[in-house]
């Protein structure tokens, strides 16, 4: 089973559409449905892709901290936080990634996403974020 390596010069990431990316890093989405499985387990950066599922925004307004008529302009094309990928389980014809220990970044970090799971970003991109503490071994697993 693949695990994140805190001493590596790069950090694993996953690209997720909005609002799911925001929901994962807020701890409001614990199971994220995906079309393919992964053997990876451990800390992973959450990248907000360019896509936004507007119908999902309407369903999750409260979890996103939005007032009734407030506009939602999510971060796109940026690292918005990180979470621990705890498991990947079969869920009907899809897979569910099970997330834990979410950490939302105060400031989103611009980054290009990739389709591979995980994809890797330079550790230098996450300076000043909770991911830097993982790299230094100062954030619990």
Could you describe each region identified by the protein language model?
Residues 2-141:
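Structured alpha/beta reader/binder surfaces that contact nucleic acids or chromatin modification marks
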